[in-house]
Design a protein with these regions (language model features):
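Thiamine diphosphate
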Residues: 1-109
């Protein structure tokens, strides 16, 4: 998600400089989901435009805020990766959404 990406975001610079073609998809849910009730200090992260940061570093960046735009954004990003570029797709998601299909879906840190 966006919290984890924020801790390592400058690795996009490393990938661009070393021409490591990679596609990064970020779940931009605006905070740490370990606190879905938003009670803990520091939970809120805002909705950082990491796609713009990626562009500033020389990567391809896309921002998605509607479900119907996810597939086209991923397809365009993959074309950029196929050309040897780094691509970041920043997908705004609902912080309350949790994957219920995984055995550890209820796990929170």
């Amino acid at each position: 998600g966006d919290g984890s990406f924020g801790l390592n975001a400058m690795e996009i610079d490393t990938a661009v400089r070393h021409k490591i073609a990679v596609l990064v998809v970020i779940s931009l849910n605006g905070g740490w989901t370990a606190d879905p009730d938003k009670n803990k200090p520091g939970r809120e992260l805002g909705y950082t435009r990491y796609d713009k940061m990626a562009e500033a570093l020389g990567a391809y960046g896309a921002y998605v805020d509607k479900p119907e735009d996810i597939r086209p954004a991923l397809e365009k990003a993959q074309k950029e990766v196929d050309k040897g570029r780094v691509a970041v797709v920043n997908v705004r998601t609902d912080y309350r959404a949790r994957a219920g299909t995984l055995a550890f879906a209820s796990y929170s840190t």
